[in-house]
């Protein structure tokens, strides 16, 4: 069977053009034909799409240039200054088109500048979908892996280099940030009854030229009472008006000056102060029960090393494990002072055992050191500890476990140490802007909205 694909292009003036896109042929389909010869191959499909894109873009560009040559003031034709070539990168190949430049009209009413119509429809020398796909692939995969996948499945012609993918991703991230700091133009569509802000931090290895070995990244998950969740990420050292960006996220979820905001954190000053400054309504800080339980778990692990050679040692180990469990129970129910009293009594016993010449003196000293660290942590965060048992029964947020998984999803899968990656704070910040938008499922819409913040090297023609 032989086949031929022809495209018919009908212009606004009624002119019709026919262009042959691709041809092919094979024998009749019978039992002797191999399955590989059935239908279009990937290479033939790429060739067909590339040919269709080439003729379509060239026809659209020529029609736009003809329409823009007519002066809007007097209706006369602008004089042709020169003729150039312009390349447009798209997902279906790189197309080279004729790009005429027109001088100012002799009437001098509409414009006194040179007009390049092709630059109006090709501002970034690529289609928005091409730039969006490159940025999305670069945010989800290592740049070299993204390049290989693009080369495998798209008829790109000239496959973009790794540096091109990186620059496109950074450029889109900068646009998203400029759009995020823009003040909201409207009030929330619906007011939220309550908002939960779970914020945590992670660390990314920095490039060798930076001052420190790693830098901190803030990752937050914001949710309202309707169940809508939005992720937020930022590098404090590079963020442009970080508080305003987070305030914009709260605004989109329905935050008003009357909406209470519950801030879940590990007690560190940085995340707490960021959430406090970004909230426009009343705030309530809660210590994440996950971090608190991990501190208690460290004490329990240290207590497992207690010697059990004699029945007396086993009895002491059982008493110690029982005391740790009681400390856990009291903290879980918000009884901070009772927990501190029990910690103090246990430390007295452990310190006395550490001063003896028995076999478990070393174990007692080790457990006492870890338990004393828990005492310091609980004392410093006592105002943030609540009755977690009651809060859980009332379906109130008590943990940042989902935010921990968000840190794993945003940071470690793309920027983790096992890939031997090192990042500059600025590069990591812009990368996270794109990656967060992709994870939130709003990247396509955000990319379109942020188009107004594109900084391009040419002036807008009249």
What do these predicted regions represent?
Residues 78, 95-97:
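Short, isolated positions in well-ordered beta-strands
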Residues 60-70, 84, 97-101:
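Short metal-coordination and nucleic-acid-contact micro-motifs, chiefly zinc-binding Cys/His arrays
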Residues 46-60, 82-92:
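Short Cys/His-rich Zn2+-coordinating modules
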Residues 75-78, 111:
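Cys/His-rich microdomains that often coordinate metals
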Residues 71-74, 104-105:
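Short cysteine-rich clusters marking metal-coordination/redox-active sites
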Residues 1-52, 99-462:
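Catalytic center-proximal scaffold of phosphoryl-transfer enzymes
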Residues 63, 78-81, 278, 418:
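Amphipathic alpha-helical interaction segments
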């Amino acid at each position: 069977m032989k086949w031929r694909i022809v495209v018919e292009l009908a212009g606004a003036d009624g002119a019709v053009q026919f262009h042959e896109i691709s041809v092919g042929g094979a024998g009749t389909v019978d039992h002797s034909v191999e399955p590989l010869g059935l239908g279009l191959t990937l290479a033939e499909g790429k060739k067909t799409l590339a040919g269709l894109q080439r003729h379509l873009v060239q026809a659209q560009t020529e029609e736009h240039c003809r329409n823009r040559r007519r002066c809007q003031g007097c209706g006369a034709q602008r004089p042709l200054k020169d003729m150039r070539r312009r390349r447009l990168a798209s997902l279906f190949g790189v197309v080279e088109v004729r790009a005429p430049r027109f001088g100012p009209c002799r009437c001098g009413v509409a414009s006194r500048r040179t007009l390049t119509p092709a630059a109006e429809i090709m501002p970034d020398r690529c289609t928005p979908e091409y730039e969006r796909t490159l940025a999305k692939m670069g945010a989800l995969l290592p740049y070299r892996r993204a390049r290989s996948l693009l080369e495998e499945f798209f008829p790109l012609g000239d496959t973009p280099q790794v540096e091109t993918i990186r620059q496109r991703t950074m450029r889109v991230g900068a646009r998203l940030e400029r759009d995020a700091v823009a003040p909201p133009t409207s009030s929330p569509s619906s007011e939220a009854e309550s908002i939960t802000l779970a914020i945590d931090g992670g660390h990314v290895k920095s490039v060798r030229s930076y001052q420190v070995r790693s830098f901190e990244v803030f990752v937050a998950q914001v949710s309202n009472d309707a169940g809508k969740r939005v992720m937020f990420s930022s590098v404090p050292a590079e963020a442009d008006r970080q508080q305003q960006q987070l305030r914009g996220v709260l605004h989109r979820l329905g935050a008003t000056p009357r909406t209470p905001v519950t801030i879940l954190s590990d007690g560190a000053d940085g995340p707490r102060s960021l959430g406090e400054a970004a909230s426009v309504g009343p705030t309530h800080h809660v210590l994440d029960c996950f971090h608190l339980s991990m501190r208690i778990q460290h004490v329990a692990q240290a207590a497992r090393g207690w010697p059990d050679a004699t029945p007396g040692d086993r009895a002491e180990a059982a008493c110690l494990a029982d005391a740790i469990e009681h400390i856990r129970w009291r903290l879980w129910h918000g009884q901070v002072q009772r927990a501190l009293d029990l910690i103090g009594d246990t430390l007295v016993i452990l310190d006395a055992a550490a001063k003896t010449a028995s076999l478990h003196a070393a174990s007692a000293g080790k457990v006492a050191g870890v338990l004393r660290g828990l005492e310091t942590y609980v004392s410093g965060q006592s105002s943030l500890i609540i009755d977690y048992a009651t809060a859980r029964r009332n379906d109130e947020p008590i943990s940042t476990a989902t935010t921990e998984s968000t840190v794993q999803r945003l940071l470690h899968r793309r920027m983790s140490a096992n890939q031997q990656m090192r990042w500059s704070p600025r590069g990591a910040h812009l990368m996270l802007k794109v990656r967060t938008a992709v994870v939130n499922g709003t990247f396509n819409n955000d990319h379109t909205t942020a188009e107004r913040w594109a900084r391009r090297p040419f002036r807008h023609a009249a």
